[in-house]
Every structure is written in structure tokens, then in C-alpha cells.
Regions:
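Non-catalytic, surface beta->alpha helical segment in thiol-disulfide oxidoreductase systems
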Residues: 61-108
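Thioredoxin-like thiol-disulfide oxidoreductase module
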Residues: 34-52, 60-64, 98-106
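Residues that form or flank phosphate/diphosphate-binding pockets in enzymes
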Residues: 14, 40, 91
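Conserved short-loop catalytic and cofactor-binding motifs
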Residues: 7, 33, 45, 84
Length: 108
């Protein structure tokens, strides 16, 4: 079963707030993993995304692993709104919507 994970942090940020508003609008409830309070969450995010960018959303399997290895980033490219297949970090509203549709979390 496909699951939607969202990495967050305790002090929040505008991108995290935007993602939450969009997910509320889309009536989706992700599994939130807080990198400020959950050590494993920070480690997983570093391993998968290569940085601690929040929010990062992951299309995951039952074990909460990405459904496929994230696509690599081009050298020196920021992660903001880059759809890397199974993950997207700091998405815009349109980027998040496209990611959710592609993975079947949201109807087109």
C-alpha cells in the first residue's frame, strides 16, 4: 500500500505551511515525520534527499521506504520544487499537486 510521508520540523517555515494548507485542501493526511524531534527522521531525510529540506514529501511503501530510489540532483542545484521521482522537497502548490496526481494520491 502506498503511503505519503511528509518530513517537517518543529519551528515550521512558509513552505511547510503551504504544503499543509494544500494537503488540507486536497483532504490528504500524510504521515508526518518531524526531523526536530525524531532522530531517525532526520537521518532518513539526509539519506534520501541529501539535505534536511522541509517539507519533503515521499511516496513510500508499507515500511516507509521510498517506492524507488530518488533521482539524483544535478550538481549545485537546489532541491526546491525538484520532483525526484519518489520525493519532492519544498514544493510549490503546482509541483505538489503534480507529484500527488502522478503517484495516485490525488485524482486529476
Amino acid at each position: 500500500m502506498l503511503r505519503l510521508l511528509m518530513f517537517t520540523r518543529a519551528d515550521g517555515c512558509p513552505d511547510q505551511d503551504l504544503a499543509r494548507r494544500c494537503l488540507d485542501e486536497f483532504e490528504l493526511k500524510p504521515i508526518e515525520l518531524n526531523i526536530s524531534t525524531e532522530h531517525d527522521a532526520a537521518r532518513w531525510l539526509m539519506e534520501w534527499a541529501g539535505c534536511l529540506a522541509v517539507p519533503t514529501l515521499v511516496a513510500a511503501d508499507e515500511r516507509h521506504d521510498p517506492i524507488a530510489p530518488p533521482l539524483p540532483l544535478e550538481p549545485c542545484r537546489p532541491v526546491r520544487n525538484v520532483d525526484r521521482g519518489s520525493i519532492i522537497s519544498e514544493p510549490t502548490r503546482d509541483g505538489l499537486r503534480a507529484f500527488l496526481i502522478r503517484h495516485g494520491f490525488l485524482a486529476s
